């Protein structure tokens, strides 16, 4: 569905949840699947791991189970690998790169069909972001809020695995450039051993058929 937002050294796959997974689960993954309480979660897990294994195949690495950290719920990648998995109701996606080439990867999918209470902006956005949103027409403001929310999800998913620092929504300030379909973010706090307060970086976003994808890498 989505073209890759990454350079060639990062492998990206996206899948429609209404179709069977391309890559079957490995035994340990299948065992974990049976612990999930709903068919929805099982479908998302199966397709997310399928996308991850397809992405890993580019690097010709021996297949390993990609399980989930019981405490942080992040995927447990092979030692030489950095990656991110996301799903949102209708689609799943994964992005993978080798640790020699990339320090961290973060992706997030959001369905724009889902109605979101705009009041959550007070919990997600810093003052600068709120000012920008409040100057937009209501439909554009809701769209902008979703991009900011998704971008911050991608930022956390990129930085947490390599820093073990919990970032909260207001620890990052996001600026959106609609013309280039990019966003820039500035961190207000340090991520241990990885970034300092004031760190500034950019990512990309794409919207296709009411589905939003945000992506960053370091």
Q: Predicted segment positions?
A:
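Core catalytic alpha/beta fold that binds nucleotide/phospho-ligands
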Residues: 1-218
């Amino acid at each position: 569905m989505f073209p890759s937002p990454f350079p060639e050294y990062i492998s990206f796959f996206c899948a429609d949840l209404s179709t069977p997974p391309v890559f079957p689960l490995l035994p340990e993954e299948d065992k974990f699947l049976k612990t999930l309480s709903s068919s929805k979660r099982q479908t998302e897990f199966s397709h997310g791991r399928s996308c991850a294994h397809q992405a890993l195949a580019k690097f010709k690495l021996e297949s390993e189970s990609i399980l989930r950290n019981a405490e942080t719920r992040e995927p447990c990648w092979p030692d030489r690998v950095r990656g991110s998995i996301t799903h949102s109701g209708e689609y799943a996606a994964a992005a993978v790169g080798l640790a020699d080439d990339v320090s961290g990867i973060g992706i997030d999918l959001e369905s724009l069909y889902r109605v979101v209470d705009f009041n959550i902006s007070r919990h997600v956005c810093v003052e600068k972001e709120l000012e920008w949103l409040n100057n937009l027409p209501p439909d554009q403001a809701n769209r902008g809020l979703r991009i900011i929310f998704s971008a911050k999800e991608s930022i956390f998913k990129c930085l947490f695995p390599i820093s073990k620092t919990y970032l909260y929504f207001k620890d990052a300030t996001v600026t959106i450039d609609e013309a280039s379909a990019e966003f820039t973010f500035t961190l207000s706090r340090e991520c241990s051993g990885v970034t300092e307060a004031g760190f500034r970086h950019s990512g990309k976003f794409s919207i296709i058929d009411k589905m939003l994808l945000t992506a960053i890498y370091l």
